[in-house]
Amino acid sequence: MKKMNAIKVILVAIILVTISCKKAEETTSTEVKPTFDLAEAKTAIEVAGQTFVMAMNKGDSITLANCYTKDAKMMGPNEKSVIGRTEIQKVFSSWIKAGMPTFTMKTIDIWGNEEMMAAEEEWAFSDKDGKILDSGKSIELFKMEDGKWRMYRDCYNSDLPSPSK
């Protein structure tokens, strides 16, 4: 009788261990982490670039500023960095008030991962007759904020020689 009870206890223990292991496997397999899609992220960065160009040419400092994260840093040549979306909007607003030539931008390359994306761009400003006034290049780092890829760092400079003092 004692032997029979011992066998029952062992059998119940084996069944419980087997069931608990299966439940752990099921829980693990149902936890689906969204996969990062590089092609989708690249498309989003390209669309963000198009939005930036349109806003620049419309003179829309609010849309321009919203292309940046709240803690963004804009790093232009020969000046201190501008930090934060609000300050970046002020810069664009001052440029727009001074009069903006036509802006174009061409994406050269986009790369990155789910944490950070980067874009290499070539840009130009031209007058109403199409004459290039300035051209240059930039590197932008993007991070996800509020469900959108936004510029986190924007570093740009001109291809023209530095102005003489």
Task: List where the protein language model places each region.
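C-terminal motif of bacterial Sec signal peptides marking the signal peptidase cleavage site
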Residues: V17-S20
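A mature extracytoplasmic/lumenal domain signature
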Residues: Y68, N78, D109-W111, E121-W123, ...
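Short, low-complexity N-terminal intrinsically disordered segments enriched in polar/charged residues
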Residues: K22-N66, K70
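A short gly/proline-enriched turn/hairpin at secondary-structure junctions
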Residues: K73-I83, W95-A98
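Sec-dependent signal peptide recognition
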Residues: N5-V12
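Surface-exposed, charged secondary-structure patches
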Residues: Q89-D129
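Short beta-strand edge/turn micro-motifs at domain boundaries
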Residues: K22-T27, S135-S162
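Hydrophobic pocket/interface hotspot
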Residues: F52, L64-A65, A72, G84, ...
